Amino acid sequence: MASLPEPQKLARNFARCNDWEEKYLYVIELGERLDPLPDEWRNPENLISGCQSQVWIVTQPDEQGVLILHGDSDAAIVKGLIAVVFSLYQGLTAQEIVELDVRPFFESLALNQHLTPSRSQGLEAMLRAIRAHAAALL
């Protein structure tokens, strides 16, 4: 599994960036930490609709019920957004993912204010897809 920061550390690192260019570079760097997605997972079933870029997300429960998240995108900034989302959900069960509202975290970063409308819609589509996958396991 990718080495992603815990949400609190992610927020601290984000706050240390001097401007939005640095924040974007940090998000892109987080995306580079994601494990490669196997080609067989790049299929229509795992493709997230509602994203301008191609985004694939795969969820797999482990033996303790924790959801393991895998994802990729053909756009560097979107791949970074996937990593940010995964850092919020890492280590959680399907029930915890369904119950967790991550929107306040994104609001605290003011990220949506600096994303294009299509990127914001794509981010929402990713969140909905992960929650739907988690809910289907309950």
UniProtKB/Swiss-Prot annotation:
This protein's pathway: Cofactor biosynthesis; iron-sulfur cluster biosynthesis
Localisation per UniProt entry: Cytoplasm
Keywords: Cytoplasm
Domain of life according to the entry: Bacteria
InterPro entries: Cysteine_desulfuration_SufE, Fe-S_metab-assoc_dom
GO biological process: iron-sulfur cluster assembly; sulfur compound metabolic process
GO cellular component, one term: cytoplasm
Gene3D superfamilies in alphabetical order: 3.90.1010.10
Location of the active site: 51 (cysteine persulfide intermediate)
Classification via Pfam families: SufE
NCBIfam families: PRK09296.1
Complexes and interactors: Homodimer. Interacts with SufS.
Function per UniProt: Participates in cysteine desulfuration mediated by SufS. Cysteine desulfuration mobilizes sulfur from L-cysteine to yield L-alanine and constitutes an essential step in sulfur metabolism for biosynthesis of a variety of sulfur-containing biomolecules. Functions as a sulfur acceptor for SufS, by mediating the direct transfer of the sulfur atom from the S-sulfanylcysteine of SufS, an intermediate product of cysteine desulfuration process.
Protein family per UniProt: Belongs to the SufE family.
Protein name (Swiss-Prot/TrEMBL): Cysteine desulfuration protein SufE
Organism per entry: Pectobacterium atrosepticum (strain SCRI 1043 / ATCC BAA-672) (Erwinia carotovora subsp. atroseptica)
Originating gene: sufE
